[in-house]
Regions:
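N-terminal leader/auxiliary helical segments
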Residues: 1-190
C-alpha cells in the first residue's frame, strides 16, 4: 500500500483511487495456476511485467478500468522490484535474533514505517472500495476476485500498527529511499 500511495502521488495521469487500490490488491486474489496462465515468466521464474502492461490499449479504457490496470501493474512491478532490491537494505541484527524472530521483527518494523507514510490515506476511500462492482470488464484479468480484494483491503485498514518496532534493524531513511527509487523507476517505465 505504501508503494501504491507513492505511485498515486507521483503519477502525472489522472487516477481513480478506489479502482487503483482494488486493482493493486487483485493479484493476490488469483489462484496460483491461473496467475501463471495470465502472466509470462522466464525460466528463472521472473515475471515479464512490461509484457503485461503493453497488452492494454489505455486509450480504449475508461478512467476506472485504466486505474484498475495501473494498480494491478503497480503490484506486479513492485513485487519484482522488491525481489531484486530488498537485499540492498542493511539489516543490523545486533540483538542476535533467531531467523524467525528476525523475520518477524523486520516485517513489524517495515509495516510501522509503511503506516507512518500512509497515515490513513486510504481510509477516506473505504466506502467506495466496499461498493466496488464485481464486474470489471477487462478480459486479460480473468481469475481475479473483487470480493476477495475488497476483503483484503478491509483487513489491511483494520490492522493495528505494530507496537514492537526495531528501528535499529533497518534504517527508516534507507527503506524510504528504496521505495522512492522504485517509484521513480516505475514512472519511467510507463
Amino acid at each position: 500500500m505504501h508503494f501504491g500511495k507513492l505511485f498515486i502521488e507521483n503519477s502525472e495521469s489522472e487516477i481513480h483511487i478506489p479502482s487503483f487500490i482494488v486493482g493493486m490488491v487483485s493479484p493476490e486474489t488469483i489462484e496460483e495456476d491461473d496467475f501463471e496462465d495470465l502472466h509470462t515468466f522466464d525460466e528463472d521464474g521472473n515475471m515479464d511485467v512490461r509484457e503485461f502492461y503493453e497488452q492494454f490499449d489505455f486509450k480504449n479504457l475508461n478512467l476506472k478500468e485504466k486505474s484498475f490496470v495501473l494498480g494491478y501493474y503497480c503490484h506486479l512491478w513492485f513485487d519484482e522490484y522488491y525481489k531484486f532490491n530488498a537485499s540492498k537494505l542493511t539489516v543490523n541484527n545486533n540483538a542476535d535474533l533467531t531467523d524467525e524472530e528476525l523475520s518477524l521483527a523486520v516485517k513489524s518494523t517495515l509495516r510501522n514505517y509503511d503506516s507512518k507514510y500512509i497515515n490513513n490515506f486510504f481510509e477516506k476511500y473505504f466506502k467506495e472500495i466496499a461498493g466496488f462492482k464485481e464486474d470489471i470488464n477487462i478480459k486479460e484479468l480473468g481469475g481475479i476476485c473483487i470480493k476477495k480484494a475488497r476483503d483484503k483491503i478491509a483487513d489491511f485498514l483494520s490492522e493495528d500498527v505494530p507496537e514492537s518496532v526495531y528501528p535499529q534493524l533497518i534504517d527508516e531513511h534507507e527503506y524510504m529511499s528504496l521505495m522512492k527509487n522504485g517509484c521513480s523507476k516505475i514512472m519511467r517505465s510507463l
